[in-house]
Amino acid sequence: MGVAAWRRAARTSAGAMIVALAVGCGSDSTGPDVLDNGSMSAKIDGASWSATTAIAATYNSNILGIAGTDAAGRSVGFGAAVSAPGTFTIAVTSPANGLVNEAGKAWQAAGAVGSGTITITAISATGAKGTFQFTAAPVAGTGATGNKVVTEGVFDVTF
């Protein structure tokens, strides 16, 4: 693997790890009221979804990770390397990714798997807002099948 390919893989893996951690930490019922972190909603396969149980958001060293969970335990998250507002494409050469988790089954858009965009309209040391949409492929070994299509995603979060 060449140096450029290794760097792309490392950035994508780091972003995916941030999203996974945010999704996992977002459902901690013993922690603070993370709904104070803002709002997040989207459509998953055409059905409305809203983070009603937990929202976790982090921004450190220009890496943004945001995830939310609804009352049924369905989680949506995404991450990207962000230093300023803009649109970030989920693709092989991009350190951006998206994730859906339902009942332990996982779908991911990262690198060569899936596609989509994350648009950051505002970002600061205290919060971020924007939109997201992606098509996520099933993660092997989780029991997930078919793709998950996330559209009309909107977020407004604080860190």
Residue ranges and their predicted role:
Residues 26-29:
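Bacterial signal peptide processing site
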